[in-house]
Structures are given as C-alpha cells and as structure tokens.
C-alpha cells in the first residue's frame, strides 16, 4: 500500500508539472494585436535567445533591464500634441482656478502650444526647455497627492481628435502586449520619459507600473515648513508635506536620459524602446552594452488613418532609424490596431 501511495503521489506531481508546462504560452501567443512582421520577429528571436540558458547570449534575470520612452512609444502624443503640453495649455489658459495667476513665461509657453496645435505655427527654438520651466512654475505649491489627482482628473477627458477613449486610456494596445511578454520572460522595464516624472507616474498607474520604475523630468521638492533652508539643514517633521517648487532640476531628454539611467537604475539596458531623436542617446547607450547582446526599437507614427500622423515625415525617420542600427516598428504595418477597435479618429475641434 505504501508503494502504491508513493506511486500515485509521484504520478500526481508529474501531472501537475506537466499541466504547468502545457499552460506556458508560446512567444507568438502574446501578440494578438500584431501582424506577422519583421519587428516582432526581431523581438521574439532576441528574447528567446537571451533567455535560453544554453545560448552563449544568455542574460541572467537580474540583468534583463529594458527602458521605454512614454509619449509616442506606448501612449498617444498626437492629440494634438503631448499630454504634458495639453495639460499645461489648459492649466495656464483655461483653468479657472489658476489662469489669472499665470506668469508671463507660462503664458508665453501655453500660447506657443496653442498656436502650434491650432494654426501650425512652429514652436520657438529650444521649446522643450521653455515648456519645462513654465511647467515647473505652473504646478508649484502643489503637494504630490494634489498634483497626482490634478493629472488624473485631466486625463479623464476625451482627447482632441478622437472618440471612444480618454487620455487615461490612450495606450498603444500592441505595446501593452510587449510589456506582458517581457514581464513573462523576467525582464524588468522602466519608463524613461522626457515628461514630468509625476505626470508619467499618474498615467501609468493603471498599468501597475511601480513609481520607482518611472524616470522623467524633475523639479525640486521641499517641505512646506522648510522656508529658505537648504534640505541638508532642515529636518522633515511628521506634520510636514512635500511641495513641488518652480525650480527645474532636469529635463530628461537625450543624454540626460543616459545620465538618469546610470544614476537611478545602475545597469546598462539590454532592450530599449522609443520613437524620436530624444531617445537616440538612450538607444545608443543600450547598444553599447559590452556585457550582453542588446537591441533598440523605434516606433514610427506612419498610420494616418487611425492616428493624426504625418506619414511622409514618419517614413523619412524610419529610414534614419534603420541607418542608426535600430529596429523600426511601423504603427501602420505592424499593428492591427493602435488604441483599440472602438476608438475612432475624428477631426480636431478648437
């Protein structure tokens, strides 16, 4: 009887293990919203190679680091501009609780955005920094929870140029499948965006991405009772609150992305995803990884049927990215959908 019991125990364990193995997904099964395309094949081939312990390119779990830009990489940016531009325009020009307090520099930045999206007037040179400094001022004095709530409340709006989704829902659905696939293969991914760190945290919160895996533009934070004291000279009290200030610390673009990755992650990525020249430095840092095989992917916004894209411009960029050694993801040819079948592109309304 004891031998029979042991036999059935072993049989039961074997069947359980077999059931677990049979439930494991094939790589292709993660990608229901992708067409059969070269970019997806490149990603799957890479992941299968570096996760195979028998491969000379095997990467230990702890070093499977991936960096993702946000705007235009896995969330919309053509409605009609970046989320952080749209919310600043609203804050400075339309928010009844703030617009009368906006400074000249904030008004300059917000009006530049409005002129750009409504009439196509080019943004001033170095506008990324003009916007960053204006944004630092526009939200100064807010606590972290207050700013988070402000962003999430604005994100409940329907983005201009679309029907069937809110800003908070405007994720590229095929890219969310990439998140799931990489997570299933024990990669750790970080959001490394040019947008405000706390805006990014608010937008990706619904995806379950932890705040400590989000890197972005930063402003100085200080206690509400700190006054003019430096942080090194002030002791935070249990009754204190952290406030945003109007002091810009860093705009997280280009080589600043590399700097922040080195400082905050402490490891060179093995995979990198982006969509613009602001991501090239991050990609090159990844491809320069001397320890492990690496890949970099660039999305191009070439789908002018489902998104407000400039196809001609996107195709030129695609060629530029290929020449730089990046794998190009075509949103028109590689995706079956962008935002989901129930989302419809419509004309902008101003």
Locate predicted features.
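Non-catalytic pre-domain segments flanking phosphatase-related domains
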Residues: 8, 21-70, 78, 92, ...
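Short, function-defining helix-loop hinge/capping sites that tune catalysis or transport
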Residues: 77, 81-84, 226, 283
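A metal-dependent, Asp-based hydrolase signature
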Residues: 79-82, 87-168, 173
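Bacterial N-terminal signal peptides that target proteins for export
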Residues: 1-11
């Amino acid at each position: 009887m004891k031998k029979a019991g042991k036999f059935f125990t072993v049989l039961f364990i074997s069947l359980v293990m077999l059931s677990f193995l049979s439930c494991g997904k094939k790589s292709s099964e993660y990608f229901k919203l992708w067409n059969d395309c070269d970019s997806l094949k490149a990603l799957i081939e890479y992941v299968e190679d570096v996760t195979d312990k028998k491969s000379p390119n095997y990467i230990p779990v702890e070093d499977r680091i991936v960096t993702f830009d946000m705007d235009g990489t896995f969330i919309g940016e053509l409605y009609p501009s970046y989320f952080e531009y749209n919310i600043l325009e609203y804050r400075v020009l339309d928010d009844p609780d703030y617009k009368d307090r906006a400074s000249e520099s904030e008004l300059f930045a917000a009006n530049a955005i409005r002129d750009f999206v409504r009439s196509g007037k080019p943004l001033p040179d170095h506008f990324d920094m003009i916007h960053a400094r204006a944004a630092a001022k526009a939200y100064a004095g807010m606590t972290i929870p207050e700013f988070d709530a402000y962003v999430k409340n604005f994100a409940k709006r329907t983005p201009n140029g679309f029907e069937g989704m809110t800003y908070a829902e405007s994720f590229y659905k095929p890219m969310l499948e990439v998140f799931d696939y990489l997570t299933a293969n024990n990669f750790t991914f970080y959001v490394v965006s040019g947008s405000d760190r706390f805006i990014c945290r608010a937008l990706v919160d619904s995806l379950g991405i932890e705040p400590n895996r989000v890197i972005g533009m930063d402003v100085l934070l200080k206690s509400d009772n700190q006054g003019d004291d430096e942080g090194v000279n002030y002791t935070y009290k249990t009754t204190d609150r952290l406030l945003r200030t109007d002091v810009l610390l860093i705009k997280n673009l280009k080589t600043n992305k590399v700097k922040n990755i080195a400082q905050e992650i402490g490891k060179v990525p093995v995979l990198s995803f982006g969509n613009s020249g602001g991501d090239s430095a991050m990609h090159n840092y990844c491809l320069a990884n001397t320890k492990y095989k690496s890949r970099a992917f660039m999305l191009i916004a070439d789908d002018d049927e489902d998104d407000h894209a400039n196809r001609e411009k996107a195709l030129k960029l695609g060629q530029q990215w290929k020449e730089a050694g990046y794998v190009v993801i075509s949103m028109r040819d590689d995706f079956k959908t962008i935002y989901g079948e129930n989302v419809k592109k419509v004309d902008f309304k101003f």
